[in-house]
Amino acid sequence: MTASLTTKFLNNTYENPFMNASGVHCMTTQELDELANSKAGAFITKSATTLEREGNPEPRYISVPLGSINSMGLPNEGIDYYLSYVLNRQKNYPDAPAIFFSVAGMSIDENLNLLRKIQDSEFNGITELNLSCPNVPGKPQVAYDFDLTKETLEKVFAFFKKPLGVKLPPYFDFAHFDIMAKILNEFPLAYVNSINSIGNGLFIDVEKESVVVKPKNGFGGIGGEYVKPTALANVRAFYTRLRPEIKVIGTGGIKSGKDAFEHLLCGASMLQIGTELQKEGVKIFERIEKELKDIMEAKGYTSIDQFRGKLNSI
């Protein structure tokens, strides 16, 4: 009995649910091509701003024993660079599954302008609005301000008619899950992506008695194994609170087939990999696909839908 990882997401069919997390291995067209030619089921572009950004000073990304700390500051080549890439790829590979396109403006107005550009283009993929970057000095995470989140989405959906998801920060309180889900349920969202890195962690080099990343006096977003329990909780919380039409993408701490299975069991439809992709490169997708299939076959599952979201309580 062979397990199939075929994943239906919105109106698209992907060979498996795995993709990169925006920010990892997607800065240049070369990296995007490597993702497109890998075993990943889908891929997403680097979060784009209006103009090219260099991001924060280095060192700004460090691998640590159980994950990573980063304070990248949204370095990217600007929206025109990525839009040109995806439009060319659509034209050259018309039968390929839909591409994900990420945007992350520095203000509501910039986000609206970025989304207008996508709305007015021939892009026929899926857009992800990043409401949760924790690493831009002086710019708070929009999605921790519930009123601002609602205002942003009201303005977005006044004109944006293409499939749109939002990338969320981690939440830690049931009241916050409830409030955010109530807001999100008011809009025709395609999905939520939980979670972005846990913001403003601190990692210390004891030998040097110093922080390890330069920006923000060493404070940075934490990813990898450290964040998996929080990621699973957010996936589960939103899966059980959102309208069934709003899918959940699970991101955080996925480095094995077991991790992937747990995210799917909590209700995730697609899975994004960040820290471990940074460490292993695109070959991770082949490994993790095999590991997930092995788990499913050992349990007698032939498709992900047989267990997705069916987490047992005790």
From Swiss-Prot:
Catalytic residues, chain numbering: C133
Activity's dependence on pH: Optimum pH is 8.5. Active from pH 7 to pH 10.
CC cofactor note: Binds 1 FMN per subunit.
Gene Ontology MF term list: dihydroorotate dehydrogenase (fumarate) activity; dihydroorotate dehydrogenase activity
Broad class of where this protein is predominantly found: cytoplasm
Catalytically driven reaction(s): (S)-dihydroorotate + fumarate = orotate + succinate
Location in chain, cross-link Glycyl lysine isopeptide (Lys-Gly) (interchain with G-Cter in ubiquitin): K46
Residues at which FMN binds: K46, S47, N130, K167, I195, G224, G252, G253, G274, T275
Enzyme nomenclature, EC number: 1.3.98.1
Cofactor(s) recorded in Swiss-Prot or TrEMBL: FMN
Xref: SUPFAM superfamilies: FMN-linked oxidoreductases
Sites where the protein binds substrate: K46, N70, S71, M72, G73, L74, N130, N196, S197
Biological or metabolic pathway of the protein: Pyrimidine metabolism; UMP biosynthesis via de novo pathway
Coiled-coil regions, chain positions: none
Assigned protein family: Belongs to the dihydroorotate dehydrogenase family. Type 1 subfamily.
Subunit structure: Homodimer.
Name of this protein: Dihydroorotate dehydrogenase (fumarate)
Native organism: Saccharomyces cerevisiae (strain ATCC 204508 / S288c)
Annotated gene: URA1
